[in-house]
């Protein structure tokens, strides 16, 4: 039993060390100008690996954004519209405010602190940011362009404890190279009766 515990402990230490080194490397890549010529083939493999890991490890906390981003890995997604039925976003105060004041389709953009881990809005904000909310035929729909901006630095860490900055332009590089594929996600739920 002691041998198993020691191996488990060493495996966890190794995973933590690799994870920390990966975060440092990702931070280094994020500091470069976002231009295709700035990244070697090996750098793109590093970014792609981080992208896949980010989706796999983030899925338990952020299943919707992991779903959106993972589908970008499939060439068959390119240019498509994919509809997902889920009411996960209806509990958001931000979304409820938009529905309470709805008169026409509205583009969604949360305040910057909404993306911070621990904020009650971060799961919905990450999945639906830049989307357009509209109500039609008793349904609430949010159309989200699943594509990466060339320049956008997002802080996903815990304030005062952990600073995890993600330069989304790194994923834009993969998109430009055809390694990931943009599409439109449409999240749909029944309009709540108020």
List PLM regions with ranges.
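Catalytic toxin/effector domains delivered as secreted proteins or via bacterial secretion systems
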Residues: 64-71, 76-194
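Early compact domain cores of eukaryotic multidomain regulators
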Residues: 33, 40-49, 53-66, 70, ...
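N-terminal Sec-pathway targeting helices
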Residues: 1-18
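Membrane-interface motif at the C-terminal end of an N-terminal transmembrane signal
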Residues: 18-34
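Prokaryotic Sec-type signal peptides and long signal-anchor helices
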Residues: 8, 13, 24, 30, ...
């Amino acid at each position: 039993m002691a041998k198993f515990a020691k191996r488990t402990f060493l495996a966890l230490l190794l995973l933590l060390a690799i994870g920390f080194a990966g975060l440092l490397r990702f931070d280094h890549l994020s500091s470069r100008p976002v231009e295709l010529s700035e990244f070697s083939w090996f750098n793109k493999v590093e970014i792609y690996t981080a992208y896949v890991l980010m989706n796999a490890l983030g899925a338990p906390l952020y299943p919707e954004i992991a779903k959106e981003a993972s589908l970008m890995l499939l060439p068959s997604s390119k240019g498509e519209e994919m509809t997902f039925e889920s009411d996960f976003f209806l509990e958001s105060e931000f979304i409820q405010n938009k529905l309470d004041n709805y008169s026409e389709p509205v583009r969604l953009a949360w305040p910057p602190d909404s993306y911070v881990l621990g904020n009650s809005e971060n799961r919905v904000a990450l999945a639906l940011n830049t989307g357009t909310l509209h109500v039609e035929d008793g349904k609430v729909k949010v159309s989200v362009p699943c594509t990466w901006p060339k320049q956008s630095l997002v802080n996903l860490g815990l304030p005062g404890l952990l600073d995890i900055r993600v330069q989304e332009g790194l994923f834009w590089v993969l998109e430009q190279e055809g390694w990931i594929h943009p599409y439109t996600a449409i999240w749909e739920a029944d309009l709540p009766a108020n």
